[in-house]
Amino acid sequence: MSDEIFPVPAEWKKRAIVDAEKYRHMYEASINDPESFWRREGLRIDWMKPYTKIKDTSFDPHNVSIKWFEDGTLNASVNCIDRHLERRAGQVAIIWEGDDPSIDRKITYRELHDEVCRFANVLKARGVKKGDRVTIYMPMIPEAAYAMLACARIGAVHSVVFGGFSPDSLAGRIVDCASSCVITADEGVRGGRKIPLKANTDEALKKCPGVKSVIVVKHTGGAVAMEKGRDVWYAEEAAKVSATCAPEEMNAEDPLFILYTSGSTGKPKGVLHTTGGYMVYASMTHQYVFDYHDGDIYWCTADVGWVTGHSYILYGPLANGATTLMFEGVPNYPDASRCWQVIDKHEVNIFYTAPTALRALMREGEEPVKKTSRKSLRLLGSVGEPINPEAWLWYHRVVGDGRCPIVDTWWQTETGGILISPLPGAIATKPGSATKPFFGVQPVIVDAEGNVQEGATTGNLCIDDSWPGQMRTVYGDHQRFVETYFIQYPGRYFTGDGCRRDEDGYYWITGRVDDVLNVSGHRMGTAEVESALVAHPKVAEAAVVGYPHDIKGQGIYAYVTLIAGEAATEELRKELVTWVRKEIGPIASPDLIQFAPGLPKTRSGKIMRRILRKIAEDDFSNLGDTSTLADPSVVTDLVDNRQNKAG
């Protein structure tokens, strides 16, 4: 935890859309009179048939039902494209930056309209109808955005599967939502390496007899097999169709997309988002959290295969008529200056990335950052996991030169958009804290029995009432939706995250509740111990898990990756134990420290703690599915060098 407070800079108070007084006024209105508040905010998007009903929601476990703006009709692609054509047809909608730094493209709103209509007509020609599910398994290229918006235009439900997932994972997601059509590319490119997307698709489709059509975008030109009658080249089909396509009129509660997310148990859940409430919330959070002004160049580094890419590369920014940057590559290719070079090249004003990426770049030192200008930057954002204060301070001081506020955003695939975050012109920030709730969001902290905890406290984070961006169900399994989120603390949405609220009412996400350690009866979030370790000057990254301990119940097992060039010695191991004792207290002292050259991460950068827990428990006979790991070989090293070997 950092005690430092960073006040809102004076110039931000003047120019921000929301200042401190406006935040207080709007937040109170959103809680005290949600009907009136959301009636007004719903008008930020265009409706074909205006809504008269605002909110019809129940968190009662016997009748969980979430509906917003339910009698209104609209089309998401119209809100992202057509409504901007009168004023900004020639404005750049998407800047595409290729994996190769010499390749980029700029797509205007007029061009986006034509490309999306063409793609929509190709889908229709292949038999895709309103309500059909379409699986998109694509690299980060403009055609991925065209495909998503084309589905929205004709009322098909897209299910985007991250291009790093294995054929098995892809097959499971295709089967679960009964997709009849898959959109893919010949190959993807990341960090100079090719990813065989079409070959993976072919492998997956051996288990998916329901797929009748595969549309293939030619990206690298690599040789791929094409199955006659099923597979078509997108460019050939696009040449046959018109660049106009009338949008389908959709009910606010018609599905827009399904996105699969891992649960703590069982197969991935198909998180279902609908059209009206999601679009209102994505647009609104993008504008207020990032203080988006007309003309800003906005870059979110996520992949469209994750919810962050859906809400904050595509739907939110485009609904607001923004210029959004899509990046095919990785932060350290060809070298560790890549992100900062892209910011200079495209004069990016708002930059939104993940702590994992920042910690990796921190390891490389300041020089790769300092040799770039970054003078266009105005605002920095963090997403995906709690950001440790050390990384926050580096981000602020080194990347932002001490002049850019940081919005540390907390939300989930399930929430559709940001729930807790500073608004940069309204809320002073504390390194490591997501600070305050967004409009309409009522966080509560409860203990294990469900009792609401007041004031400064620690416990389980729940949300007390619905918001428009909330998921509506688990696709095809409403009972799982109810059991996962509404049974444990009846009448509340349970986030699965632990949280601390400080004496100023600021919220600090402490990690998943299943990442909580109980050491000698003391509760401790793994994020807290990790932050202490990473604060040591020789440590680049740390992950902490519990393991069975004869005396304490649970011991603390720390996996530590050192800064490049530092040696893993017994002296350093002892020094780190002393360091953590000093930072948090004796109760937090790691019992075992394993130096690790790398940690098992998914391709989106999340650490697979399940694997780390198994290794720490000396139980690696069943490590589960490791196909989603970016580098499965790190697991072998971790097992070989584990510190808790039996006997």
Swiss-Prot record:
HAMAP family: Ac_CoA_synth. SUPFAM superfamilies: Acetyl-CoA synthetase-like. It comes from Parvibaculum lavamentivorans (strain DS-1 / DSM 13023 / NCIMB 13966). One of its GO terms (molecular function) is AMP binding. Mg(2+) binds at residues 534, 536, 539. Acetylated. Deacetylation by the SIR2-homolog deacetylase activates the enzyme. CoA binds at residues 190-193, 308, 332, 520, 581. This is Acetyl-coenzyme A synthetase.
